[in-house]
Amino acid sequence: MKVLVIGGGIGGLSTTLALRRHGFDVDVVERDPAWGVYGVGIIQPGNALRALDSLGLAEACVESGAAIRGDRTWLADGETQIAAHDWPPLVPHLPPGNGLTRPKLHEILTSSTLASGADVRTGVTFSEIAPSDDHVDVAFTDEERRRYDLVVGADGLYSKVREHLFGPDLKPRYTGQVCWRYNLPRLEGLEEIWMFFGPDGSAGFVPLGQDLMYILTIETPIPEWRATIERDGAAAVYRRRLEPFAGPVAEVRDQITDDDAVVLRPIENIIVPAPWHRGRIVLVGDAAHGATPHCGQGAAQAIEDGIVLAEELARDVPVTEALDAFTARRYERCRAIVEGSEMVGKWEQDHSLPIDPDATRNAVIMTASAPI
């Protein structure tokens, strides 16, 4: 079987590696000529490490990152602790969780993909997809044309493959919050995710390496405020947003000085109705189910998608039957995670809502920890 994967990010490369491990012939196209990655760091919870372990990549991630043992929560004063959880490991020889820079994860995935024998072309994407009952003809922006048995849309939250399949009206929805991120030297004693909750949002730290962490802030902006800022002065804006926080957040606030290193994004999500395929074209990862960051499951679910899709295709059944089985295994799990993560964000915006954020997070964790 010959497969085209559109998108060279976490979901696309995980899918490629899983397919190659089952012996499928895979082409990858990535529209970014530099095949780079944007962002700061990423949380790999236990189920992400479990999935990466099945691809032979978990130990490389752990060696390049920082173990996460659990989470700790305080009020904005930095002194009043309100929660502490130690995470159990899902894989005996791996830590409960891991923090890693996005560039390092990208390096691990790209080098493994190239070593797998997949045909990777960068600076290229599709210009036309013409499906039929037994194949898909694809025209590319470099004027090549190729024929495939299956096309996988792994092109992220703003997926063009999704738009091709389902139309322009099915798109990510802004959930009312924004997220700031910035890399900093790691605080002494940071072995867990530390979060601090204030009246209008939260700030926290995630370990990424022996000497590195990132600070993140999830907040509800004023209605007329947009989740975009000018590069000049971005660090000063972020520092001002952190002024309500005392304790460790206040201690590191003045270290935020590099405008270009500030990452600010609107928090959006999407869940594409089942099934996630039309004929021989299927969506994976954020293209199908982009979650908000409140439960740290976005990348984990994308990796799981690739593993499950490869397993179903390896059963040697008709392609559409395998794709139906893929959606059947993935839809309810991903829906629960997307909706649960959004509920936590809703509670952060309005504490009067009848939502128990701890119970909601626990439900998401239980869903994600279950076998795939």
What spans do the regions from the language model cover?
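Conserved N-terminal helical subregion
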Residues: M1-V3, P45-F166, L170-N183, I222-W225, ...
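Conserved mid-domain beta->alpha element of the FAD-binding
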Residues: I6-R21, D25, V29, V152-G153, ...
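Conserved Rossmann-like nucleotide-cofactor binding loop
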Residues: G11, A34, Y158
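Conserved N-terminal glycine-rich FAD pyrophosphate-binding loop of Rossmann-like flavoproteins
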Residues: P33-A51
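Active-site substrate-recognition segment that forms the wall
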Residues: Y182, E192-W225, A235, L242-F245, ...
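Short helix-loop capping/hinge motifs at secondary-structure junctions, enriched
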Residues: P185-E191, E224, P248, R315-D316
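Flavin-binding catalytic cores
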Residues: T228-V263
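C-terminal auxiliary extensions adjacent to catalytic cores
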Residues: N362-I372
